[in-house]
Amino acid sequence: MEGVMSEAPQSSIRKKEYEARMSRIRSRQEKEFRERKSANARYAEETTEKLLNKYYEQEREILEKKSSMKNGFYVPKEAEFFAVILIRSKCNCPPKVRKVLELFRLKRINTCVLVRNNKSTRKMLQIIKDHVAFGTIGMELLRKLVYTKGSGRNGHVRVKLTNEFIEDMFDGKIRCIEELVHHIYNGTEMFKKVNSFLYPFHLSPPRGGFKGQKSKSFNDGGSVGNHQDLLSNLLERMI
């Protein structure tokens, strides 16, 4: 008696067809993502070179202007933003101080945020000056801060900065980390959106510790308050 081969159940056939179709879709998506990642990497490299060249050209023009002013006094352009670091606990602080710290998203010790330099911000900094160190920083330190400690916000989730994540969050208007730095440093119309996207920077305690008594004003040999353009001395040791 000859054996009769039974046909595979229709459900099994449909399952195999589905798995094969999904495998093709995954392969296509992976290929598209690799191509996108490669294109974004090229874009980031070209954009970084272009923006840095523009910045260094501006710096050269400033140096030339300084050297040409023999008897005059060069007044540098006011910084577009402040870096603000929470270095003292908010426990037992007045409600007004706590409110400003919350507005600045300063929730834990050794957290740094960037805020636009304007009249309103300067008033708020005076309210919290006994709990924070703040001042201005240069392009190189800003780049180091964003590249090494930067992360982005997706809803309430903290996400590592990648070109693809940035591109998705800004609908292609911004595609790399260097463009984030550019908008912050130059205070462009995208400053607010970029700054809201960046998660507060979580820093380490400063190498070598704080100079003097931390609770004393920077002008009196301590650490809190306005460091002006000397904040980089502290921030560099916390990155």
Curated annotation (Swiss-Prot):
Does DNA-binding appear among the keywords?
no
Instruction: Give the GO terms filed under biological process for this record.
Output: maturation of LSU-rRNA from tricistronic rRNA transcript (SSU-rRNA, 5.8S rRNA, LSU-rRNA)
Recite the UniProt keywords alphabetically.
Ribonucleoprotein, Ribosomal protein
Molecular function in Gene Ontology = RNA binding; structural constituent of ribosome
Q: Which GO terms describe its cellular component?
A: cytosolic large ribosomal subunit
Q: Which domain of life is it from?
A: Eukaryota
CDD domains documented for this protein: Ribosomal_L7_archeal_euk
Q: Which InterPro entries match?
A: Ribo_uL30_ferredoxin-like_sf, Ribosomal_uL30, Ribosomal_uL30_euk_arc, Ribosomal_uL30_ferredoxin-like
Region: Disordered; residue ranges are 1-22
* Similarity comment: family membership: Belongs to the universal ribosomal protein uL30 family.
Name of this chain's protein: Large ribosomal subunit protein uL30
Organism, by scientific name, is Encephalitozoon cuniculi (strain GB-M1) (Microsporidian parasite)
